[in-house]
């Protein structure tokens, strides 16, 4: 929906996701979410996420930046920090080194954090046709991850924007468009 609304304003927009976002990154994504991946050690999972990000960056994000496209990505480095580093206790110093090694100076201009109630999260998960391994984690994990995102957002209000989606989904979408429009000065 955001892509469509931004295109109406004659903006060149690329929508992407992580893990995935390029042909090679999608191959890694398929491995991450395969049935056998539930037996992967947490470090293996972490490095697969980074491998996918590297492919995504090289094959999608950097070319998009060169073309001056507006990129909307469903998840990026903060998700790795929230899910793998904080959620699965991966060493944050190791993550910082790896993040800088892969991204170099590449960073998102804006991160929108969607806050939702546990009831809403579970309701959305029930509507999905197929659940992945992250969807099947305990509520305590979701709370921990969401708290990390909220803390990131509160600690850097210039880069992050926190939107409560548990109130009304339509108003959340409207607010997201307002935030993006303000950031892009359109």
What positions do the PLM features span?
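A glycine- and Lys/Arg-enriched "phosphate-lid" helix/loop adjacent to the NTP-binding pocket
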Residues: 79-147
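NTP-dependent small-molecule kinase module
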Residues: 3-5, 119-186
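Residues at the C-termini of beta-strands that transition into short coil/loop
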Residues: 17-19, 115, 166
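Generic detector of well-ordered alpha-helical packing
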Residues: 1, 46, 75-79, 110, ...
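ATP-dependent small-molecule kinase phosphotransfer cores
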Residues: 11-103
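A short, Lys/Arg-enriched amphipathic alpha-helix followed by its capping loop at the start of a domain
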Residues: 1-11
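Hydrophobic/aromatic beta-strand patches that form the interior of the parallel beta-sheet core
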Residues: 16, 72, 110-112, 161-163
């Amino acid at each position: 929906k955001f892509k469509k609304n931004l295109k109406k304003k004659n903006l060149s927009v690329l929508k992407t996701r992580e893990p995935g976002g390029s042909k090679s990154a999608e191959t890694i994504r398929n491995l991450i979410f395969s049935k056998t991946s539930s037996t992967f050690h947490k470090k293996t999972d972490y490095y697969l996420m980074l491998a996918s990000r590297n492919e995504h960056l090289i094959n999608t994000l950097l070319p998009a930046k060169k073309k001056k496209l507006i990129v909307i990505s469903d998840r990026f480095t903060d998700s790795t920090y929230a899910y793998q580093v904080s959620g699965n206790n991966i060493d944050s110093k190791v993550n910082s080194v790896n993040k800088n090694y892969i991204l170099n100076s590449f960073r998102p201009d804006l991160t929108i954090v969607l806050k939702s109630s546990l009831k809403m999260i579970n309701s959305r998960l029930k509507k999905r046709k197929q659940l992945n391994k992250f969807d099947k984690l305990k509520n305590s994990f979701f709370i921990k991850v969401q708290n990390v995102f909220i803390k990131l957002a509160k600690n850097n209000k210039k880069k992050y924007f926190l939107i409560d989606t548990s109130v009304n989904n339509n108003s959340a979408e409207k607010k997201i468009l307002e935030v993006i429009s303000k950031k892009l000065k359109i």
